[in-house]
Amino acid sequence: MYDYGLSVLSHYGLTASGTMRVRGALLCHTEQGDKLISEFGTAAEKLEQRYLLQCRITESGLLRCDQILRNEEGALATRGDDGGTYIVRNWYPGRECETGNSEDLIRASDALARLHTAAHLPVKMEYRRESLVEECIRHNVEIRKIRKYLQTKKKKNEFEKLLLASAGPYLEQGERAAAEMKASSYEKLRQRADEEGAVCHGEFSQHNILLENGRGE
């Protein structure tokens, strides 16, 4: 029988008094508060980095987050009786941010600002992306190669003709974007972010924000 990972709670010294299926996870009411069980679907190294970042956010005291828990063996992921691998996170009562509610959006913006203040880690080169200027220049080179190929191709289908006609305007926009970024303070901002260990987070949508007691968490 598929237990949605409920069996892993015993590895955390927890017992569920009640459960509820929620979006992509199992919500459990335990003697240590609400916990969320979800399937483990990322590389172990990334999970460790996620854990460290969440610890930094939690320790900052600026906001609460769905902190991943280590099991009694010290691991972040646990295999369940159904053969699946799961993670267990802290969870909190609250409601999702309503995008049509201006007060909710103000609270969400405040939470985002606190997240940016708290989300810092020592820089690891393997997680450091190329700059937007470099990325833009790289894409411009790719557009030139495609345009040159299509220009030399004698027989073109309808799609290739349309693509060739579009290449020029797209390249013009790309070159303008690269030039404007070079002339801006982007590189200084990026250098400062590197020095501070600022972390680029993923999607920040209403589904990822819980509001409780008038505060966005």
What is each model feature region?
Residues 197, 202-207:
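Residue immediately N-terminal to the catalytic "proton-acceptor" Asp
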Residues 23-26, 72-76, 187-190:
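Short, solvent-exposed loop/turn elements at beta->coil junctions and helix N-caps
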Residues 2-32, 71:
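ATP-binding glycine-rich phosphate-binding loop
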Residues 41, 126-199:
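ATP-dependent phospho-/nucleotidyl transfer catalytic cores
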Residues 1-5, 16, 54, 58-60, ...:
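Gram-positive cell-envelope targeting signals
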